[in-house]
Amino acid sequence: EKARKMIEEAVVERVSDIYLIPRGENYQVYHRIMDEREYIQELAEDEVMAIISHFKFLAGLNVGEKRRSQQGSCDYNYVSGEISLRLSTVGDYRGKESLVIRLLYDQDQQLKFWFGALERIAQEIKGRGLYLFSGPVGSGKTTLMYQLARLKFPDKQILTIEDPVEIKQEDMLQLQLNEAIGATYDNLIKLSLRHRPDLLIIGEIRDAETARAVIRASLTGATVFSTVHARSVAGVYARMLELGVSPEELNNALQGIAYQRLIGGGGVVDFAKGNYQNHSSDKWNEQIECLLAAGHISPRQAETEKIVLGSTA
């Protein structure tokens, strides 16, 4: 009951992550909404252990293992409906376990984009190759990829690889990671190419192995959408190099980079088709100034949302 109430309250607040962290003899609960982490309450250790065991059981994790890290996911039923959860646990040096719960909301909705960004990007997607999307947690990256997929690839073979599947679609072949049976990003990408998809959507490039697999897929003639964690267009390019992709391979495969945030009730997108390393933040900052002038955001928020040269990672 405590666990269910915890999820219900988080959904109402549109929380992206719930943290259960050991502090002394008790546990502290935090919520993350966009980029802000907020302290919620302190709970007794036995209460939290019961909550963690509850979620681990539902996600098929080893309930008795408290030191080694474990990851899993589940669909969680509560009073108002169902939500997908992604779970990550790890024990500290004392053997006290922490849990982070990522809430994956049903994003199958038409996200509003400022300044005609959706149509503008759709016009730029013309050839095969790799298109990368980036932005903070909850900024609508997956929603943008799916909206572009429906707009540009109607009645085409679309295959997705995610961890877990965030937007369930009957007209797409959707695969979900399961490392226990060898269903890794690398293996599923190899498998997916045998299905000859018109569009391959890969949830996230997290490591060098996935980065290489994504590059290979895009160089074999497929159109590939994927996400990378970075704070700007230039940061996405730099991150791919950090993951071991050579500049030659990246330049051959890459067809565009989109960076986005949810600002003033809609998506603001910066899109580039080349010269990624030296991409100027001027157009992004001009969009922020327009939102400020129209009264959609405050002066303080405008300063926070602007991209300063050098903030790329």
Regions found by a protein language model. Name each.
Residues E1-A313:
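Short, flexible helix-loop junctions that flank or precede catalytic/ligand sites
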